[in-house]
Amino acid sequence: DVYKRQLCMAVSGKCYLSLHEMNASANRGACMQICRRAYSVKDKDSNIELDIENQYIMSPKDLKTIHFMNKMMDAGVRVFKIEGRARGPEYVRLVTECYKEAVRAYCNGTFDEKKVAAWDERLRSVFNRGFWDGYYLGQRLGEWSSKYGSGATKKKVYVAKGIKYFDKIGVAEFEMESGNLKVGDEILITGPTTGAVMQTIEEIRVDLKPVDETVKGERFSLKVNEKIRPSDRLYKMEKVQLEKVFE
């Protein structure tokens, strides 16, 4: 049983920070993750405050094992557990897709560095606090996040809501509520039943006519790989300029 997950500084699970500060018990699944914030270290006796290089001293990087899954499967591992509590549907879909592809690649003999690099790039595009190997490969010291929040290379920007889906032709109608969409944009559609649909726009139609772009206030249609529902939310995926890229 091997994990792909966000790591907690309370390895035993006995953490009371969230309960003490926010009245939300981590041990009952309600952790507010205030350990992820920046903290200073102060000696209460001498009133001396330590100047530390990284303020996020209680926020470990996320565990990622996909690049050495072949070694673990060689060793006999047969169950990989993926944790996604408090993560968006796009995180759940993309991470499970990558790890499933890795297992299949190992089984059919096509697991290689090129595929690992592609999986790594995709995993960096959704919520993460940077990645490390855990202690699987002999590392003795932990690695810690260098910023608060996500280090994802992409962000989702809400632009439209679902109106109708035409099953026979696989086309969905949406209404733009902000921003714009262009042919070639990468999009994410989410909903309670739909889950997460991710694809690149190949064609946009407004009043049944092909257009290069649609803007706020317009109704438009496009081919969608899976069924969507009214009130589903459509996001445009945009690249994030990170001040510091997580390793």
Specify the residue positions occupied by each region the protein language model found.
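Short, small-residue-biased leader/transition segments that mark boundaries at the very start
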Residues: 2-3
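Extended, alpha-helix-rich binding/interface surfaces that flank or overlap catalytic cores
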Residues: 82
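Glycine-rich, positively charged active-site loop/lid region within alpha/beta enzyme cores that binds
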Residues: 11-54
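Beta-strand/loop-dominated core regions that host nucleotide or nucleotide-derived cofactor-binding catalytic loops
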Residues: 146, 152-247
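Conserved active-site and cofactor/substrate-binding residues in soluble primary-metabolism enzymes
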Residues: 26, 30, 63-67, 75, ...
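Anionic-ligand-binding alpha/beta catalytic cores of soluble enzymes and soluble regulatory domains
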Residues: 85-161
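Catalytic cores of alpha/beta
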Residues: 10, 17, 64-78, 94-98
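Active-site mouth loops of central-metabolism enzymes
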Residues: 51-64
